[in-house]
Amino acid sequence: SSAASDVYKRQLDQTQDFFMDGGKNVRPASDENVRNNIAGIGRIIQEANCDVQFLQEVDKSSKRSYFVDQTASLSSLIGGTNAFAVNYSSQYVPFPLPTIGKVQSGLLTLSSFGALKAERIALTGTYTWPVRVAQLKRCLLVERVPLEGSDKELVLINLHLEAYDDGDAKQIQTEELLKLLTTEYEKGNYCIAGGDFNQMFSEVDATKYPLIDSSYWQAGTLSSDILPEGWRFAVDDSAPTCRLLNQPYSGDRAKTQFYVIDGFIVSPNVEVEAVHVIETDFQYTDHNPVKLEAVLKK
């Protein structure tokens, strides 16, 4: 079986920057811009030809994406089942100027397998009231796929961990993720978790995508030491998985801050055959998809 994490962040394409990353903009220039980017992302999804897609930051009804229902556009692409878990829902986000306004956004999992059930599991956040009212409520989207001739399940977890915190929330959320994964594995289930960890991986060569300016957002590092024996990260650093949105992307790689923060965790009974970043040159979004090909061990 194969699974892919296609990670999309507000469909901010090559021409965009974003205020939280040091840029100026809150949203793309027009709804046409949003629709073009969604169409481009759709083509990438279809070309990747995966059984499962983990998508993050998919808007259902948000001012920032001109109220285009992206879940509807993307859900029809590969057939099978789809599940959506909201992690950002606010009637009005009062910052910056112009304001973000209404947001309804979350995680979308597309599966050609047909899942038994899908469940939203809340993760611990560290924002306090009133700030948390206008912040993301991080979660995991967990799907269970029955396996023929077995009482075990394939447990698929779509994730997007905290971004702009001091590191505490990410650490807590990572621990919560690992606790869930190990519990499922101990039942004999097969586990694949994937998405945007907002952290670099210790397997990645840190000199490949160094911090080029000390004022830029710096990702913490996820050490493989935190994984129980036999578990592994499935990541690839042949291309970056994300760019900083402090400025539009000119294609000048020397002046662009890159990261490898997207990938997978797999249980010991899942054999990784290949994992690679699909290089899209950030044409439609500020993340590159990561494709995992894996086999469930008998």
Predicted features, each with a name:
Residues 1-95, 99-104, 298:
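N-terminal, active-site-proximal structural segment of metallo-dependent hydrolase catalytic domains
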Residues 2-6, 37-67, 110, 143, ...:
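Active-site beta-strand/loop signature of hydrolases that rely on acidic residues for catalysis
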Residues 9-10, 59-62, 88-92, 115-116, ...:
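Solvent-exposed loop/turn segments at secondary-structure junctions
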Residues 24-30, 58-60, 124-133, 160-168:
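Surface-exposed cleft-lining segments at the edges of enzyme active sites
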Residues 75-78, 102-118, 145-146, 255-271, ...:
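Conserved beta strand-loop-helix elements of the APE1-like EEP
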Residues 82-89, 118-124, 275-278:
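Conserved S-adenosyl-L-methionine
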Residues 91, 95-154:
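A well-ordered secondary-structure block
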Residues 144, 168, 179-192, 198-298:
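Metal-dependent phosphoester-hydrolase catalytic domains
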